[in-house]
């Protein structure tokens, strides 16, 4: 993440000075433009983010991906066997937890299954969590998770996922969803998220680092499981 922000020029190796940003806005530039009256939406930190992004090559997320919605069957459809049903609580930027509920295979035979390179993005609850799938899946996600499919070759899926999980997008999600009592990020707002575009070679470099970090994380998980098994066997042997 540090390398991404550094390459985008949003941080550097020099000591940071405290920046005080003040804004004075007219009603025509606030409520009439955005429809928002909550003060949180107009915090100076968001103006600063906008000013920094304005200096970079960018595109709207909706220009880069095709956004697909999933289904929301309701808790009455939950069962212990069938197609795994992934909810936001099962999703994090490092992967998917094993879902605790399933859906009937016959009833939901035609429900969309996310495929390889699909980016899962949460829009409700813990908004803005992104994870890219490495393989095709036989699972269904809740309606609170969008399926993003990259349609422009100028952006790599791993790079885009990294940006989506970065403070650059987190702040945009925070601004958009902050006015709701229950956090909800509208798909129309998500499509307007500003994505900085780095040159292809730098995207490839960052993507390779992301892949390497996931591989190391998987290896660490295997070693941890083996260590736990050894401890359990040692305890059983001395019992």
Annotate the PLM regions:
Residues 109-112, 122-163:
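A short beta-sheet element
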């Amino acid at each position: 993440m540090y390398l991404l922000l550094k390459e985008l020029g949003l941080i550097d190796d020099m000591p940071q000075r405290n920046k005080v940003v003040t804004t004075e806005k007219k009603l025509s530039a606030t409520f009439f433009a955005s429809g928002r009256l909550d003060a949180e939406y107009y915090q100076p930190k968001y103006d600063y983010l906008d000013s920094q992004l304005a200096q970079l090559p960018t595109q709207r997320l909706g220009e880069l991906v095709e956004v697909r919605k999933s289904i929301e069957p309701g808790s009455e459809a939950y069962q212990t066997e069938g197609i795994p049903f992934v909810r936001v609580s099962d999703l994090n930027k490092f992967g998917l937890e094993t879902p605790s509920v399933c859906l009937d295979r016959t009833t939901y035979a035609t429900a969309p299954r996310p495929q390889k390179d699909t980016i899962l993005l949460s829009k409700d609850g813990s908004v803005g969590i992104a994870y890219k799938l490495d393989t095709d899946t036989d699972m269904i996600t809740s309606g609170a998770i969008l399926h993003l499919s990259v349609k422009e070759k100028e952006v790599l899926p791993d790079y885009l996922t990294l940006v989506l999980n970065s403070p650059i997008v987190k702040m945009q999600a925070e601004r958009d969803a902050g006015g709701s009592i229950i956090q909800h990020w509208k798909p129309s707002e998500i499509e307007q998220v500003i994505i900085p575009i780095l040159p292809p070679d730098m995207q490839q470099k960052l993507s390779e680092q992301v892949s390497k970090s996931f591989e190391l994380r998987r290896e660490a998980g295997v070693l941890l499981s083996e260590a736990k098994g050894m401890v359990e066997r040692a305890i059983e042997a001395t019992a």
